[in-house]
Amino acid sequence: GEVIEMGRIAIEAKLFNDIVRKLPNSEIFIETTPDYNTIIRCEKSKFVIPSKSGEDFTELPQIEKEKSIELSQFSLKEIIRQTIFSISDNENNKLMTGELFEVKDGVLQVVSLDGHRISLRNLALKGNASNVSVVVPGKTLNDLSKIITGGVDDMVTVYFTDRHILFEFENTIVVSRLLEGEYFKIVQMLSMDHKIKVRVNNRELFDCIDRASILMR
């Protein structure tokens, strides 16, 4: 894109996203008026939407980039996909609406649970990784998975503080507050003293469950 004149404006995110999604695949021109209206033009389409001064927009918190890990966008997207389904939507227990991100001895462990299911995913990290343990809101991870490309060679750097988590990739920065509190002791929940243990082909198991689920509708 080309910046003709520098400036700042605050636009309602959902409205702006809905407009851009409906526009044709062509050049988009965005300009603002002195009374903070934003004009969006694309081919024969024109939208005029109310906005606010960019000075009123909340600044991103200053994140100290001391504790961090790096992994591929593919790995992060897969981790979220394999764990996000077992977070809870019950706001009465905030910790269950998030996922535990714990880094220890060079291994990232991501855990989610909703009181009925537990999902756990481990990933060996390359290079030096800071030991951390934080709970990330599920909504943040769900939104993040929609905007990362998932490329194997595209990297994401994740920074941790006591209150925030920051994801940095390409030209994008995503910052989120963390959920407060101590996460559940997963090791105590996962007893390894199994009387019966089976090993099955995951594709065949998925197909069986998929067929059986027809009768549950």
Residue ranges of predicted features:
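Structural preference for solvent-exposed beta-strand-turn elements
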Residues: 1-217
